[in-house]
Amino acid sequence: APVILERAGRVLLTPEKEVALGGFINGGESYVINSNPRLPWCHVLSSRQFGTLVSDMSLGFSYAFNSRELRLTPWDNDTARDNIGERLILKTSDGRFIDLIQGSTAVFSPYKAEYLFKGWGYSGSAELSVSDKGLCKRLRVKIRTDSPAELMYYTEPCLGFSRRHSSLILPEIADGVLLLSSCASEVKGWMSLSCSQK
């Protein structure tokens, strides 16, 4: 049976200066989106070698070196839909699946994207940043739940221009890290996913 994803609930923040669908906070350093835009409200975080395009409703897509040629996760050029190749999902003890980004409050600043969420039996935040050097994207999640729950990071690997050759992606696990490579990619290399808990 297909999994039904619920939306997370919003944590409303009061802007210091209201503009459009939200406003500025933290002395003008950050912009909070307090309502649902009709189209995805996008934000780019990047270094010279790596980047990610996120929105108010999704973790978007990521790329290395060139956003067209070496997409790590898929990108869709449909402005009415969002890029959903990366997601943060909470599975509750009663079997519900909640997309913690979709429906949350998005806060964008030049160096990070933060999502604040709450709902029945859970609350927390997710902070996304890109390292200045190297090819690294970090997602820090703080979450409180009333009962045991599982936190999942969903990614749809692409490793190239399009998903056309995604069946050629080879997975490997080494020292608790998921490594992915593709013989069809124009640029040879690895994509790795790892998780740590504090």
Predicted regions located by residue number:
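Anionic coordination/interaction segments
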Residues: 1-198
